[in-house]
């Protein structure tokens, strides 16, 4: 008879959790930042607020965003005007839209990841799904499992209302699942739609205006497993360690409150300083065990909360400009897609590395870091190890 220890050892994988495929998706509707102020004030029936529109236009100009993809269209706003009004009761219709579209958009990214992986979907043992909006029972994880035709025995984890740091949270969760369940293949999906936060402008809510200028819709997916079979699977990044911390006395720095009017967004002006002043401690704790203290020796996957956050982190750590290129590219092309962003950036980095004929998926470097920042103020830190782009 086997002992508990022998049984547990047999349950565990031998190697580190590894990302085996990545997929991303966006809605079809694209908005361009250069004329978004005109669009936004027109569809919210706010063109009479000329001074506020000028202020919003300046926010858009400084956002470093070229375009975003947004599910909500002008036709939908005409049909449901309360969504576009400032603080009008509208949660019911927002929920109707979100609970249908969040899993559908997640499916689009998941299908791309599954196609790249190339293995039967029946081999997916676990599903980890996160979104900032659309809480219901059964949840988006259940709907996605059905949309994809996953096995009814798939073990699901659903994370709601985590916010922008959750791209790190889902990787941390997937790492634990993959490494503690031999043979596990974990499908991770982040799907974000801004229908829950969209509303008209107000002089009394400038932090809400910042959110209207930054956030976009998108979904991303990865497949994670330990001990990959390299004859049929292609490793991309290893998940070496993962940690979460929150900054004391910063509970309201980034916040969202779900009310009859939807999800309201709140942001302290000093968020870039709070993050930049605390990020090096996270780096030190993560990389001291590896003997790494040169932050420019790492490849960087940082959540693009906004240009001010990226600038502050870059300056505080004396990072070379190229370190945040992949992050800035995703911000420019898609905006801030909350939890989905960091997986978009991972995808951009591996593609850029292959296109540039770099030696590894991490732009030729071995070690990297993935950061998620969000409500709490919470920081997720994931240590990554790249893999060679060419195998012998």
UniProtKB/Swiss-Prot annotation:
EC top class named in words: transferase
Induction: By stress, including UV light, ozone and pathogens such as B.cinerea. Strongly induced by ergosterol, a non-specific fungal elicitor. Positively regulated by jasmonate (JA) and methyl-jasmonate (MeJA). Induction by phytopathogen attack decreases with grape berry ripening.
Tissue distribution of the protein: In leaves, expressed in palisade and spongy parenchyma cells and, to a lesser extent, in epidermal cells after induction.
E.C. number: 2.3.1.95
Coiled-coil annotated spans: none
Catalytic activity: 4-coumaroyl-CoA + 3 malonyl-CoA + 3 H(+) = trans-resveratrol + 4 CO2 + 4 CoA
GO molecular function: trihydroxystilbene synthase activity
Keywords tagged on the record: Acyltransferase, Cytoplasm, Genetically modified food, Plant defense, Stress response, Transferase
Gene Ontology cellular-component annotations: cytoplasm
Claim: Transmembrane helix is one of the keywords in the record: no
Transmembrane segments: none
Major subcellular site: cytoplasm
Binding-site residues for substrate, renumbered to this chain: 55-58, 267, 305-307
Record's description of how this protein is used: Driven by a stress-inducible promoter, stilbene synthase is used to improve resistance to pathogens which are sensitive to stilbenes such as B.cinerea, P.palmivora, E.lata or P.viticola.
Gene Ontology biological process terms from the UniProt entry: biosynthetic process; defense response
Subcellular location field: Cytoplasm
Active site residues per record: 164
Pathway in which this enzyme or protein is active: Phytoalexin biosynthesis; 3,4',5-trihydroxystilbene biosynthesis; 3,4',5-trihydroxystilbene from trans-4-coumarate: step 2/2
Function recorded in the entry: Mediates resistance to pathogens which are sensitive to stilbenes such as Botrytis cinerea, Eutypa lata and Plasmopora viticola by enhancing the production of phytoalexins. Confers resistance to Phytophthora palmivora when expressed in papaya.
Quaternary structure annotation from Swiss-Prot or TrEMBL: Homodimer.
Family: Belongs to the thiolase-like superfamily. Chalcone/stilbene synthases family.
Name of this chain's protein: Stilbene synthase 1
Organism lineage: Eukaryota, Viridiplantae, Streptophyta, Embryophyta, Tracheophyta
């Amino acid at each position: 008879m086997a002992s508990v220890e022998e049984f547990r050892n047999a349950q565990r994988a031998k190697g580190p959790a590894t990302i085996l495929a990545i997929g991303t998706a966006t809605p079809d509707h694209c908005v361009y930042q250069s004329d978004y102020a005109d669009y936004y004030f027109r569809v919210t029936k706010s063109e009479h607020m000329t001074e506020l529109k000028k202020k919003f236009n300046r926010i858009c100009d400084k956002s470093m965003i070229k375009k975003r993809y947004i599910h909500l269209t002008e036709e939908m706003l005409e049909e449901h005007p309360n969504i576009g009004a400032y603080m009008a009761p509208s949660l019911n219709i927002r929920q109707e839209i979100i609970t249908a579209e969040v899993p559908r958009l997640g499916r689009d990214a998941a299908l791309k990841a599954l196609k790249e992986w190339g293995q039967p979907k029946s081999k997916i043992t676990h599903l980890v799904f996160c979104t900032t909006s659309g809480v219901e029972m059964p949840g988006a994880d259940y709907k996605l499992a059905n949309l994809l035709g996953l096995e009814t025995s798939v073990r699901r984890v659903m994370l709601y209302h985590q916010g922008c740091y959750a791209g790190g949270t889902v990787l941390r969760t997937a790492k634990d699942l993959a490494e503690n369940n031999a043979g596990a293949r974990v499908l991770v999906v982040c799907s974000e739609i801004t229908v829950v936060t969209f509303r008209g402008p107000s002089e009394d809510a400038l932090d809400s205006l910042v959110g209207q200028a930054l956030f976009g819709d998108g979904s991303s997916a990865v497949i994670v497993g330990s001990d990959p079979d390299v004859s049929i699977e292609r490793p991309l990044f290893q998940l070496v360690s993962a940690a979460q911390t929150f900054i004391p006395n910063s509970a309201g720095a980034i916040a969202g409150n779900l009310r009859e009017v939807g999800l309201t967004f709140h942001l302290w002006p000093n968020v870039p300083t709070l993050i930049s002043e605390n990020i090096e401690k996270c780096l030190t704790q993560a990389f001291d065990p590896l003997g790494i203290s040169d932050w420019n020796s790492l490849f960087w996957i940082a959540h693009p909360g906004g240009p001010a956050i990226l600038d502050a982190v870059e300056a505080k750590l004396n990072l070379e400009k190229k370190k945040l290129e992949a992050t800035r590219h995703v911000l420019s092309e898609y905006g801030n897609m909350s939890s989905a962003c960091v997986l978009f950036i991972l995808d951009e980095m591996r593609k850029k590395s292959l296109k540039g004929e770099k030696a590894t998926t991490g732009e030729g470097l071995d070690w990297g870091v993935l950061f998620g920042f969000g409500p709490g103020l919470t920081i997720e830190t994931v240590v990554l190890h790249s893999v060679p782009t060419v195998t012998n």
